[in-house]
Amino acid sequence: MKAMIFAAGLGTRLKPLTDHTPKALLPINGKPMLEHVILKLKDAGFNQIAINIHHLGEQIIDFLQANNNFGIEIFVSDERDYLLDTGGGIKHAESFLQGDEPFLIHNADILSNIDLRKLYEHHLETNPLATLLVSKRKTSRYLLFDKENKLCGWRNRETGEVKSFYPYFEPNQYKEFAFSGIHVLSPKIFDWMEEWTGKFSIINFYLSICAKTNIHAYDAENLRLLDIGKPESLALAEQWLKEEI
């Protein structure tokens, strides 16, 4: 089973902690964020993992080598010359991710209690182009889904901006969900990406194709999720992991 971890972020909201350490290597409860995610994926059965790098990427390479790649196959997708965003990052790793089976994408700065194997198996059973783990948490930007949990649009509650490729789109008629940074993709996604090049957002890509194919929401019960993007969330993550132990 294949997966990809996004570990190329600049970590600007965590400065000065990220001035000399990549965000993915910041420690939480004695282990780097990246290690927590690798082990969670490994425990769920993922044994081939791509990891993209950019800011201070050589430190991530050294970390992986020092830990013998945690006993699994790891492919480093090098974006040190140019950061490609989420969509571009996936396409850049196509040579590793392509094949007959779906693959899972996981941000390095996300902690959750999601059963990744269950999410992956749900995708296999329903067989959309992509399955997005979502939640009802409060945020400013929401993905909009219909009654069948099919992606139809996006809205920014703060600015009022709405995005959709559906004609006569009325955002208030749709369910609002926050995206988690965890999703499962069919390898057929690369056929849809053929004309997309360079740096691009996976969300903008999903929005551009959702009227033509199935991009589905997976709203897990009792989901607990933490985005470790700010210094205060590091403390929350420490507390969470201590409670788990």
Where do the PLM segments sit?
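Glycine-rich N-terminal loop/short-helix segment of MobA-like nucleotidyltransferase
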Residues: 1-29, 42-44, 219
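Conserved N-terminal catalytic core of the sugar/cofactor nucleotidyltransferase
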Residues: 2-5, 31-107, 118, 196-197
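Phosphate- and divalent-cation-binding pockets in alpha/beta enzyme and binding domains
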Residues: 13, 59-62, 86, 92, ...
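Conserved beta-strand segments of alpha/beta enzyme cores
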Residues: 24, 73-75, 129, 150, ...
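Catalytic-core segments of class I nucleotidyltransferases/pyrophosphorylases
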Residues: 101-106, 111, 117-124, 137-138, ...
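A short, conserved acidic/glycine-rich loop-to-beta-strand motif
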Residues: 126-136, 141
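Short beta-strand-to-turn element immediately C-terminal to the catalytic PLP-Schiff-base lysine
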Residues: 144-146
